[in-house]
UniProtKB/Swiss-Prot annotation:
Native source organism of the sequence: Streptococcus sanguinis (strain SK36)
Gene that specifies this protein: hisE
Domain of life, source organism: Bacteria
Enzyme Commission code(s) on record: 3.6.1.31
Identification of the protein by name: Phosphoribosyl-ATP pyrophosphatase
Similarity comment text for this entry: Belongs to the PRA-PH family.
Pathway field: Amino-acid biosynthesis; L-histidine biosynthesis; L-histidine from 5-phospho-alpha-D-ribose 1-diphosphate: step 2/9
Length: 104
């Protein structure tokens, strides 16, 4: 499904269509696209905090769509993302807590 989203976003970039929301986003440019990515990411966080599975699924779908548009706009392919994910698979993470901030 992610590939389908990406291919549809790519097609709309190459073949703009009157009245298309995707074409509208491309016309407005990267800043508008990234604003939507940020908004949708925030809505995913809220849905998760609300423990609303339906809202979570819907907002995640919106986020994935806007990420696909952002990838196309910035010239990053899904294959490039997959390569990064595959390279990370099985690697040990360097997770650690950040030091407390005591000077403001």
């Amino acid at each position: 499904m992610l590939e389908t989203l990406y291919q549809e976003a790519l097609k709309r970039k190459k073949e703009p269509k009157e009245g298309s929301y995707t074409s509208y986003l491309y016309d407005k440019g990267l800043d508008k696209i990234l604003k939507k990515v940020g908004e949708e990411a925030t809505e995913v966080v809220i849905a998760a905090k609300n423990a609303d599975k339906n809202e979570m699924a819907n907002e995640t779908a919106d986020l994935l769509y806007h990420l696909a548009v952002a990838l196309v706009e910035t010239g990053v392919s899904l294959e490039e993302v997959e390569t990064v994910l595959q390279a990370r698979q099985g690697k040990q993470s360097r997770i650690h807590d950040r030091p407390e901030i005591d000077h403001y």
